[in-house]
Amino acid sequence: MSRSVKKGAYVHVRLLKKIERLNQKGEKQIIKTWARSSTIVPAMVGHTLAVYNGKTHIPVFITDALVGHKLGEFAPTRNFRSHVKGDRKIRKSI
């Protein structure tokens, strides 16, 4: 179920304050954040946010196309390594 329209999008309070402060100054710098559940709002467009994936901060440049998505969508937490190709041959020999 999606979030109620009357509540508005969830954005971490400190993250929003940092972005508003940078917008007032007209500065662009990388902002580190652990708030993966925050929704991307139009005020964030043009900024680079370093989103934590559990190991490192992954830089995400915010564009108009990303508005409405969550920050965590762009910082994958799991690293898939392909399945072993010769696994059947190894099992037959045992």
UniProtKB/Swiss-Prot annotation:
Subcellular location, principal: plastid
Gene Ontology molecular function terms on file: rRNA binding; structural constituent of ribosome
Top-level division of the source organism's lineage: Eukaryota
GO cellular component, one term: chloroplast
SUPFAM superfamilies with a match to the protein in the record: Ribosomal protein S19
Localization terms from the record: Plastid, Chloroplast
UniProtKB keywords: Chloroplast, Plastid, Ribonucleoprotein, Ribosomal protein, RNA-binding, rRNA-binding
Record bears the keyword Isomerase: no
A Gene Ontology biological process term: translation
Gene3D superfamilies: 30s Ribosomal Protein S19, Chain A
PROSITE patterns cross-referenced by the UniProt entry: RIBOSOMAL_S19
Entry annotated with the keyword ATP-binding: no
A Pfam family the protein falls into: Ribosomal_S19
Protein family: Belongs to the universal ribosomal protein uS19 family.
Stated role: Protein S19 forms a complex with S13 that binds strongly to the 16S ribosomal RNA.
Designated name of the protein: Small ribosomal subunit protein uS19c
Organism: Cyanidioschyzon merolae (strain NIES-3377 / 10D) (Unicellular red alga)
Gene coding for it: rps19
